[in-house]
């Protein structure tokens, strides 16, 4: 991999790996090698959840568990992680197999999000919990400063349903129109039909649930509720 690209990535991350092989593994999709990033992703997912939960607990001492859970879900969901990945220009650093390269895997939200979690796992193994916690807080500073408890943190499907019920409109319908990829790495495409919108809105995700949430979020934007 191009060392100039890797050095630029590490500057954007705010962390230089002592063991470069951990960085290489974190950037490797299972389509490219048997030594891929899924175990690091598993580790990073748990670390990220803990760090964000801890930050919210101390930032909002009077907020109940339900609101904190919703805020955490907003901060650690796939599209937020994919936004971070794009801020790091992570797509140009991914190691993908020929099939994923051809199908534009370097732009796919699920792959970008999973790689951010793998990087978190890699940083932890390369350093310690204090270092990776501070790094995550640096990445999330603006988002943590801007987030607040309340209905906005309900997931998109819930907010869309409540809006439609409040206006005495039928509930949305979700239809799977495409499933791409192998069983271990699928991408679902959902059409969501909503009263008041002339055409179905489209959402994609690594599971049916995530794709439905993405479609609901697009519907909310079209209804100008975001």
Curated annotation (Swiss-Prot):
PROSITE patterns for the chain: DS_RBD, RNASE_3_1, RNASE_3_2
The UniProt record lists the keyword Hydrolase: yes
Domain DRBM: 155-225
EC number: 3.1.26.3
Family listed: Belongs to the ribonuclease III family.
HAMAP family hit by this protein: RNase_III
UniProt-recorded name of the protein: Ribonuclease 3
């Amino acid at each position: 991999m191009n060392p100039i690209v890797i050095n630029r990535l590490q500057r954007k991350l705010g962390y230089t790996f002592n063991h470069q092989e951990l960085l290489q593994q974190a950037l490797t999709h299972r389509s490219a090698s048997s030594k891929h990033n899924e175990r690091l992703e598993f580790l990073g997912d748990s670390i990220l959840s803990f760090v964000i939960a801890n930050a919210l607990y101390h930032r909002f001492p009077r907020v109940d568990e339900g609101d904190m859970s919703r805020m955490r879900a907003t901060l650690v969901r796939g599209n937020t992680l994919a936004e971070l990945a794009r801020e790091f220009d992570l797509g140009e650093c991914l190691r993908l197999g020929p099939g994923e390269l051809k199908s534009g895997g370097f732009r796919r939200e699920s792959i970008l999000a999973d790689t951010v979690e793998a990087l978190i796992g890699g940083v932890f193994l390369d350093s310690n919990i204090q270092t990776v916690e501070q790094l995550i807080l640096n990445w999330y500073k603006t988002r943590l400063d801007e987030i607040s408890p309340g209905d906005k943190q309900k997931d998109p499907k819930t907010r869309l349903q409540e809006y439609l019920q409040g206006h005495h409109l039928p509930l949305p319908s979700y239809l799977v129109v495409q499933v791409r990829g192998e069983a271990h790495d699928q991408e679902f495409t959902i059409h969501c039909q909503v009263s008041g919108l002339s055409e179905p809105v489209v959402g994609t995700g690594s599971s049916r649930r995530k794709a439905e949430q993405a479609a609901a979020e697009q519907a909310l934007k079209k209804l100008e509720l975001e």
